[in-house]
From Swiss-Prot:
Coiled-coil region(s): none
Disulphide-bonded residues: none
Signal peptide range in chain numbering: 1-29
Name under which the protein is recorded: Uncharacterized protein YxeA
Induction / repression: Transcriptionally regulated by YxdJ. Induced by the antibacterial protein LL-37, probably via YxdJ.
Length: 115
């Protein structure tokens, strides 16, 4: 009986790990130890989607510090300024925070992509 419980526990743990690896959304990515946090730099180049009762959701293409293209989706409590540059702290599809930055403060590899 103890062997069966141990095997069942190992199979359950393996199922949870496989689920974290193959199913990506903002909740699973937040806790997945295999996904690393990175800064993604974006420019507000289009309108966001207004949500009820308030706030705006943005889905934008941006670039990480090495210049790799990434898509991020995040929420803002208000509509953001057009053409503003943001640094988004993302871990997969999970966005922890965002902040407005100056163009000069972004890495050179990102500046060349967002001109």
């Amino acid at each position: 009986m103890k062997k069966a419980m141990a095997i069942l526990a190992v199979l359950a743990a393996a199922a949870v790990i496989c689920g974290l690896l193959f199913f990506h959304n903002d909740v699973t990515d937040r806790f997945n130890p295999f996904i690393h946090q990175q800064d993604v730099y974006v420019q507000i180049d289009r309108d966001g989607r207004h949500l009820s009762p308030g706030g705006t959701e943005y889905t934008l293409d941006g670039y990480n510090a090495s210049g790799k293209k990434e898509e991020v989706t995040f929420f803002a409590g208000k509509e953001l300024r057009k053409n503003a540059y943001l640094k988004v702290k993302a871990k997969g599809k999970y966005v922890e925070t965002w902040e407005e930055v100056k163009f000069e403060d972004m890495p050179d590899s990102v500046q060349s992509k967002l001109k």
